[in-house]
């Protein structure tokens, strides 16, 4: 049952983020949208942060208020719920090294790091 609850939470969070970003894109404050859909701004915040689950009826009101079809809130949901790959410790380290390398501004320093890695890679264990 825990996995199902995780999926439900991810869906609630996905929809909440869509509400939040669309509200901001439309230039509406939380208070303004809350008044249109007849809830408090605190309740709207709970929907946006997936603290409270939103009913379909309320989601329809939000879609109308934000001039969107209700389908908008579900677009991309399937992709968002795909399990993320689990990285091994080695893969995480490679990602970290790559990210840190990209932060080096100097071409000379990047070349020095590259030469060091080549040297270490050529060593026999």
Swiss-Prot record:
Keywords recorded for this protein, A-Z: DNA-binding, Transcription, Transcription regulation
Signal peptide from the UniProt entry: none
SMART domains the UniProt entry points to: HTH_XRE
Listed Pfam families: HTH_3 (PF01381)
Recorded GO MF terms: DNA binding
Residues within the DNA-binding region(s): 30-49
Cystine residue pairs: none
Sequence ranges assigned to domain HTH cro/C1-type in this UniProt record: 19-73
InterPro entries registered for this protein in UniProt: Cro/C1-type_HTH, Lambda_DNA-bd_dom_sf
PANTHER family: TRACRIPTIONAL REGULATORY PROTEIN-RELATED-RELATED (PTHR46558), TRANSCRIPTIONAL REGULATOR (PTHR46558:SF3)
Identification of the protein by name: Uncharacterized HTH-type transcriptional regulator RC0668
Biological source species: Rickettsia conorii (strain ATCC VR-613 / Malish 7)
């Amino acid at each position: 049952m825990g996995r199902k609850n995780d999926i439900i939470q991810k869906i609630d969070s996905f929809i909440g983020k869509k509400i939040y970003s669309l509200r901001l894109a439309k230039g509406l404050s939380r208070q303004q949208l809350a008044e249109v859909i007849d809830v408090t701004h605190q309740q709207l915040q709970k929907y946006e942060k997936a603290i409270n689950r939103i009913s379909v009826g309320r989601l329809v009101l939000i879609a109308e208020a934000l001039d969107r079809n209700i389908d908008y809130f579900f677009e991309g949901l399937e992709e968002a719920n795909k399990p993320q790959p689990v990285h091994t410790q080695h893969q995480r380290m490679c990602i970290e090294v790559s990210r840190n390398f990209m932060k080096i501004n100097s071409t000379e320093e990047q070349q020095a790091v590259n030469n060091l890695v080549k040297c270490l890679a050529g060593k026999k264990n």
